Amino acid sequence: MNKVPKKPLPSLLAVIGYPFTIAFSIFSFFQIGFNLEDFKRNFANRRLVTDTLFNPKWDWAIENASQALIETIQIAILASILGCFIALPLSFYASRATNQTTTTYFIYKSFLNFIRTIPDLFWAMLFTVAVGLGPFAGVLALVMFSMAIMGKLLSETIDSIDLGPLEAAKASGAKHNQAVFSSALPQILPNFTAYFLYIFELCIRASVILGLVGAGGVGRIIETQRIFLRFDRISPIIIFILVIVIGIEQFSVWLRRKIL
């Protein structure tokens, strides 16, 4: 007679982990000042926002925010191009597959890790002090932002390339840089293109936030109108940004299908 196998006992991690996670989540709600009564009371004030937010002033937005939206796109394009192409050679030095020297590998890897830990908003505040308010500060901030993300994504991609062509190029007498250029670079170019489009999309969103600290773009208009509770002027700007981001995302998906 076949015996029904016993159901295995839950692991120690499950016995301890799940209750701990639930208890810690409840504790965190109280720590951040969450209060259900305050939430209900403040939620009743939502009409201060929603009544105007869903009544967009299209004419005002087209007349006053069009140039700032174009500036936002220009900031994102320039920063993405500069940041990603600066990160391209750095990524090869930050990968074990193409850089066998421990010292230089550690230096470049640490540099990319360092700039990635600094928020883009801090870069924006730093550069607005260094070069003044305006889109140039935003471009510099997003260059650092783009370089950090591309450096991480691309260096990890290089780590997983096929080393066969690289070793064959070296065996045929090519120098290290020549071997990398002829054998490793072609393998990661499709990924580089896909990452570039992804970072460009991120820069569009980030440039809106950077405008809040005076780094150019449409963010400064959004912040000004928010102060005066003119959400009817903010909502069409948000819709414009949404359309731009969706368009970039769809183009990115189409292009990735073509090249990957």
Question: How would you label these PLM feature ranges?
Answer:
Residues L90-A124, L153-E156:
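Cytoplasmic-entry segments and transmembrane alpha-helices of multi-pass inner-membrane transporters
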Residues L112-S146:
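Generic hydrophobic transmembrane alpha-helix motif, especially the helices
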Residues V129, R205-I241, L260:
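Glycine-rich helix-loop "coupling/hinge" segments at transmembrane-helix boundaries
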Residues L133-A184, P190-I199, Q250:
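Membrane-cytosol interface at the C-terminal ends of specific transmembrane alpha-helices
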Residues W58, I62, S66, I70, ...:
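Alpha-helical membrane-protein architecture signal
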